[in-house]
UniProtKB/Swiss-Prot annotation:
Function as written in the Swiss-Prot or TrEMBL entry: Catalyzes the CTP-dependent phosphorylation of riboflavin (vitamin B2) to form flavin mononucleotide (FMN).
Keywords: Flavoprotein, FMN, Kinase, Magnesium, Metal-binding, Nucleotide-binding, Transferase
Chain segments carrying region H-T-H motif-like: 1-87
Pathway participation: Cofactor biosynthesis; FMN biosynthesis; FMN from riboflavin (CTP route): step 1/1
Cofactor(s) the protein needs: Mg(2+)
PROSITE patterns listed in its UniProt record: HTH_MARR_2
GO annotation, biological process: FMN biosynthetic process; riboflavin biosynthetic process
Species for this entry: Pyrococcus furiosus (strain ATCC 43587 / DSM 3638 / JCM 8422 / Vc1)
Segments crossing the lipid bilayer: none
Annotated region (Riboflavin kinase), positions in chain: 88-212
Residues reported to bind FMN: T180, E188
UniProt-recorded name of the protein: Riboflavin kinase
InterPro entries listed in its UniProt record: HTH_MarR-typ (IPR000835), RibK_CTP-dep (IPR039063), Riboflavin_kinase_archaeal (IPR023470), Riboflavin_kinase_CTP-dep (IPR023602), Riboflavin_kinase_dom_sf (IPR023465), WH-like_DNA-bd_sf (IPR036388), WH_DNA-bd_sf (IPR036390)
Gene that produces this protein: ribK
Binding-site residues, CDP: G97, I98, G99, E100, G101, A102, V193, N194, L195, R196
């Protein structure tokens, strides 16, 4: 694919141009993008004209920084690409839990059956979210099913938000209790089967989760 000034803007961002002013030369940038120094000069002028960068000349080269408008442009581009590539998709790695999932799934099992329509395997599959950044980012546009809390033997169990998902054609749900000890990078998944055994998963395996 033919290079453009967008490639240059991304290169400047990766070089630290968002956080600080960076010193570079057209020759150095031309080698990195495999274009002529004259092309780099023209692209820098175009980016400056569009308000995406600020630049000034020094004896050692060109000082460049990405403007606030440039940062907003890159953020918007990132959002649009993410939406196009990963719409409804969560990428994560299987991790071990602390062993409490089975207890809580058993307590909520009748309500899971009522609200989600399946008898859950007594345990959860824990997944560390790689993309998007957190489980909350992944589910922000998905409507949850609220499993109501209850009291049992003097103990209170809070509401749980459940989000229907599919992993390798097995339907289940990501569950987020109103009280949780897990960081926002961890997704707890319930299903009618033992997902680890059924899908032959081990810690570190990467999986793709589709929201429904």
């Amino acid at each position: 694919m033919k290079k453009s000034n967008l490639d240059l803007l991304i290169l400047l961002a990766k070089a630290g141009g968002i956080e600080k002013e960076i010193l570079t030369t057209s020759r150095e940038l031309s080698k990195m993008l495999n274009v002529s120094p004259q092309t780099i000069v023209r692209w820098l002028e175009d980016l400056e004209k569009d308000g995406l960068i600020k630049k000034s000349e020094s004896r050692k080269g060109t000082l460049v920084t990405i403007t606030e408008e440039g940062v907003k442009f890159l953020e918007k581009l990132h959002e649009e690409l993410s939406d196009a590539l990963y719409r409804g998709i969560i990428i994560g790695e299987v991790v071990s839990g602390i062993g409490e999932g089975a207890y809580y799934v058993r307590q909520y099992a009748p309500l899971i059956r009522e609200y989600l329509g399946f008898d859950p395997y007594p345990g959860t599959l824990n997944v560390r979210v790689i993309f998007p950044k957190t489980i909350f980012d992944a589910l922000c546009n998905v409507r949850p099913i609220i499993i109501p809390g209850f009291t049992k033997e003097g103990r209170t169990f809070g509401d749980v938000r459940a989000y229907r998902v599919k992993i390798d054609n097995i339907e289940g749900a990501i569950v987020i209790p109103s009280r949780t000890i897990h960081p926002p990078k961890i997704a707890e998944i319930i299903a009618p089967v033992n997902l680890r055994k059924t899908l032959n998963l081990k810690d570190g395996d990467r999986i793709r989760i589709k929201t429904l």
